[in-house]
A protein has these predicted regions:
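Beta-strand secondary-structure signal
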Residues: 38-40, 85-89, 148-152, 193
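Phosphate/diphosphate-binding glycine-rich loops and adjacent basic-rich segments that engage nucleotide
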Residues: 65-100, 104-114
Length: 281
């Protein structure tokens, strides 16, 4: 399956749902004996794991499980980062940009100065950071008074996550100090409004955990070789683990997710389905 070229395919995560449905149909059609199975299909995962965050976990009895939500085949993710959601609003002072620019304090310039000093992108092998949204200004001839930004910090290490978050906030403070002006005898410093909240907890499942052993044994029975990959994204598995349900992430065969080149091979989907059936068996 391929996208039409002008949009995403949606294999993330419809491929996983299709594989799960097919696996359950095979189990039912072949009368395969199995223990209790619980299936949870959440909503709004891409916009912040919303379904998983609002799910009633008292409805689930299982203590471990699998999320079908990573690219490639014969892959499993046992570790994935936690993340902080960072929202910043800077408020400077508006003025006419052509007539009296010196009477203004640009919020956009303050933001630019802060971002230019930030460590962003790949910080180290387990830590990343990004400023993903920036909005501000009302007209080309007005020194912009307000700008808002949304960013994130991610790390497998909670200490590094906190350090990166604090570093990003300190850059805004330093930029505000540098942009401070004296206007009409008054000291004008850009105001900084900050909201930092945990977005999702990290995942760290031991390689000897039952949920891993079961998947590996199922793969061996099929002649497959499940490899471990370090995760970089957030998924429902992060939230389930945070609620005490040990969950790892299995590959679904999808590639190029979130792009116009997204695709998934039917053969790979069958490969994953066979693994699911063997896990259930």
């Amino acid at each position: 399956f391929y996208s039409a070229g002008d949009t995403i395919l949606g294999a993330d995560d419809k491929a996983g749902i299709a594989e799960l449905i097919e696996a359950l149909e095979v189990v039912n059609e072949q009368d395969i004996l199995h223990g209790p199975i619980e299936v949870v299909v959440t909503i709004a995962e891409e916009i912040g794991l919303v379904g998983a965050k609002h799910f009633d976990y008292s409805m689930v009895q299982a203590r471990y499980g699998y999320a079908l939500d990573t690219e490639g085949v014969e892959m499993m993710v046992l570790q994935a980062p936690g993340a902080n959601h960072i929202q910043i609003e800077l408020e400077g002072l508006a003025s006419h940009a052509g007539m009296v620019p010196e009477r203004g304090v640009s919020a956009i310039q303050t933001a630019s100065l802060a971002i230019s000093q930030m460590r962003l992108g790949r910080i180290d092998y387990e830590t990343t950071a990004n400023i993903g949204v920036i909005e501000g200004g009302v007209a080309r001839n007005i020194v912009p008074q307000k700008v808002s930004m949304v960013g994130e910090a991610r790390s497998h290490d909670p200490v590094k996550l906190q350090e990166q978050t604090e570093h990003m906030l300190s850059c805004f403070e330093a930029a505000a100090d540098e942009m401070t002006r004296e206007i009409d005898g008054k000291r004008v410093r850009p105001e900084i409004h900050v909201e930092v909240r945990p977005d999702f907890p990290s995942i760290s499942v031991d390689e000897k955990a039952p949920v891993v052993t079961l998947a590996r044994n199922a793969a061996v029975a099929l002649g497959q070789d499940l490899k471990i990959r370090l995760g970089g994204g957030g998924s429902d598995a992060n939230i389930f683990n945070g609620h005490g349900i040990e969950m790892i992430i299995l590959a679904t065969g999808m590639t190029g997710l979130h792009t116009h080149d997204e695709s998934v091979a039917v053969a790979d989907m069958l490969h994953v389905t066979e693994l699911l059936v063997e896990i259930i068996r």
